[in-house]
């Protein structure tokens, strides 16, 4: 289904819940490549997430099987049974309402043009900023509690919640530009990004576990075929057997330096993307709950490309 809107057009694809929004002024010859690129990224992430969850589920089954006899001993002792109950949170007590308050977004003053050389002598041939040519989002597993992208300013907000009843959620979203060339060129692509995040993780006792993870990622694709990818993982936490941890927002930090490299050929459309992801997974122990919830706010300030003939 295609829905036209003031900001472009929205594509609802198959597979993961995929939404692509393309600006009205993007040339028609770029649109198919943009859609194909987002579908490729979504399939790739779905396969990776599914593998990770399957491995974790299999491991949890082994751990809870071993914890079963211990659970029977605990139930036979009043003090131990009370202690287990006290350590076991209710998922509903930790399910967050969708925050309505906007983050205090950093101020951005982007000056387009060539960037000065760095210590690595990287001189950008072209700098891209908002408004981006298109934006995209998808999720795997349970729907996210927040998934918001705005290509006009580069702002991203996303959050997930998982517990033993809804044991995983994986959300991705971001922006991109479409490029063409009239000659063979090598490209080195970088990005300037800022993020802030928060999470709560509780791994249930007696074999339970919970994981949160998030960060930002860059990709380059040729006519929808992945040619380069890089990740900047901003956080990951996995707890088990009654462990619990809360991290509040710490303030905006600049992303680590990552780079994608590829070769551009005439007659093809290249998509250069930057986005964010948040993942949460929770598996309860024997008679216990596990909870994983996380939120990431991201700001994409610029994409830079260095072209070499």
Annotate the PLM regions.
Residues 2-309:
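Mature extracytoplasmic or otherwise solvent-exposed domains
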């Amino acid at each position: 289904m295609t829905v036209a809107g003031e900001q472009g057009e929205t594509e609802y694809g198959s597979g993961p819940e995929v939404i692509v929004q393309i600006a009205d002024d993007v040339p028609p010859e770029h649109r198919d490549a943009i859609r194909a690129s987002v579908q490729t990224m979504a399939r790739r992430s779905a396969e990776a997430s599914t593998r990770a969850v399957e491995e974790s589920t299999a491991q949890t089954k082994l751990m809870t099987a071993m914890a079963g006899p211990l659970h029977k001993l605990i139930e036979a002792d009043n003090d131990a049974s009370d202690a287990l109950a006290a350590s076991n949170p209710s998922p509903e007590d930790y399910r967050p309402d969708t925050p309505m308050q906007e983050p205090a977004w950093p101020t951005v003053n982007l000056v387009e043009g060539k960037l000065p050389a760095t210590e690595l002598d990287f001189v950008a041939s072209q700098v891209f900023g908002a408004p981006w040519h298109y934006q995209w989002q998808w999720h795997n597993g349970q729907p996210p509690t927040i998934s918001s992208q705005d290509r006009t300013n580069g702002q991203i907000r996303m959050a997930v919640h998982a517990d033993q009843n809804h044991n995983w959620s994986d959300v991705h979203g971001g922006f991109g530009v479409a490029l063409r060339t009239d000659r063979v060129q090598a490209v080195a692509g970088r990005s300037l990004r800022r993020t802030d995040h928060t999470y709560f993780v509780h791994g249930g006792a007696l074999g339970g576990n919970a994981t949160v993870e998030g960060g930002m990622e860059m990709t380059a694709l040729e006519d929808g075929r992945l040619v380069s990818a890089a990740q900047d993982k901003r956080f990951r936490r996995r707890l088990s057997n009654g462990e619990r941890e809360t991290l509040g927002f710490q303030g905006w930090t600049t992303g680590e330096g990552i780079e994608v490299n590829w070769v551009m050929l005439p007659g093809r459309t290249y998509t250069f993307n930057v986005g964010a992801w948040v993942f949460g997974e929770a598996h309860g122990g024997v008679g216990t709950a596990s909870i994983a919830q996380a939120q990431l706010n991201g700001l994409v300030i610029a994409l830079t490309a260095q072209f070499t003939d």
